Amino acid sequence: MSWRAVTLTGRVAILAARYGGGFVRCSIVDYDIMRTMKYIKLRMDFEGIVSRTVVVPSDWSLAFLHGVIQAVFGWLDYHEYEFSVPGDPQKRRWTEQSASLDGFGVGKFLESSETQISALVGKKGDKIDYTYDFGDCNEVEITLLGTVAKPSPKEFATEGPDVVEDSAGVGGIAGIVAIAKQGKGKEYKQVSEWLRRAFKKHIDDVLDYPSVRDIYTRVFGLVKTASTANPKAVSPCWLDYLVVH
């Protein structure tokens, strides 16, 4: 079992605790996110560069799923978002404060907090489109891989680094990765410092919630990586690219 899968599991656990999802216990061996009967496994693909595979309760709302996506991709919820279903003849879109958006654009806006994930995907292979930050136009394709009897870190997977806020979308991330892989030079130093500042802010935001501080520390403490107390620490998913001094 990879340490990256464990840290990704921890991020979803943080969301469960942070949003009052009934988090039960946190252990690499025996692990629950919520007291629910059905879990679904979702693969989230960002333009063929970054992907995350997570397990969430099927009765979570799309608003909660938005929170999970933000956590596992490393975004900070600075911008607007929407969900849609490919090929939907009604062109429905789910977002926050949907009533204020009706009449703008094409299709009907619905409230993401009032719609369960299971209402959009029911069988293996069903897809949901997620768009975040209409400036960068970050588009994530979500695919239902199936149901899971009980979530555990082995069900979680991650490919590629976190997607930094306001990085000009997929092209920006590709450029950042290319610079980070150089390992030295002026551009590398600038990117390293920028990433450290970005993820330090994210870590500080998470640790502002006492109810999740212990969970966060214990989950991330299971792996040999930068301490969350280290002001120079970056997201674990970036440790493949950056050396933390």
Model-derived regions, located:
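Short linear regulatory motifs enriched in tryptophan with gly/pro/ser
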Residues: 24-245
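Residue-identity detector for glycine
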Residues: 10, 20-22
